[in-house]
């Protein structure tokens, strides 16, 4: 006999995204995501409870590094986030408020690689905790400036 989970709705958002020049500006996109999540959860939950919200790539920071061909180190210093960090804490508040899992992505720093950023995706549970994290393995060359694990493989596998 199998245990079947209760039916639920998943919401994929397509928010307006503002390309940021400084990390502090990311909060503007997160505030907008809150409004979009609120509307989407209200409307979608008329049928089934929303248990999963997916935020698209670029929704936190935009694609400033790609559009303006930014220097990698400048992006690390000015825009890349920490996971966990201030921005993921704000997203965790959204997950708690709407009692849902939340998938998001961001270009983020790694403690072991302080001068690099990775394009990371992460899953936040309804308690606001990051429970899964993945780094993009195949950035779109030549436009994506993020590093992938293959670029630093020897140190990555230590």
Each PLM stretch: what is its role?
Residues 74-89, 154-156:
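A short acidic, glycine-rich active-site loop
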Residues 26-39, 84-89:
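Well-ordered, non-membrane alpha-helical segments in soluble/globular domains
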């Amino acid at each position: 006999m199998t245990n079947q989970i209760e039916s639920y709705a998943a919401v994929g958002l397509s928010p307006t995204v503002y390309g940021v020049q400084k990390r502090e500006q990311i909060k503007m996109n997160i505030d907008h995501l809150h409004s979009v999540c609120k509307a989407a959860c209200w409307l979608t939950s008329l049928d089934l409870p929303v248990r999963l919200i997916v935020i698209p790539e670029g929704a936190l920071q935009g694609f400033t590094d790609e559009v303006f061909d930014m220097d990698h180190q400048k992006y690390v210093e000015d825009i890349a986030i920490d996971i966990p960090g201030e921005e993921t804490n704000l997203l965790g508040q959204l997950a708690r408020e709407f009692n849902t899992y939340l998938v998001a992505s961001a270009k983020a720093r790694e403690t072991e690689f302080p001068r690099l950023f990775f394009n990371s995706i992460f899953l936040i549970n309804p308690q606001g905790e990051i429970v899964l994290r993945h780094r993009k393995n195949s950035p779109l060359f030549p436009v994506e400036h993020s590093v992938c694990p293959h670029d630093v493989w020897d140190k990555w596998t230590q």
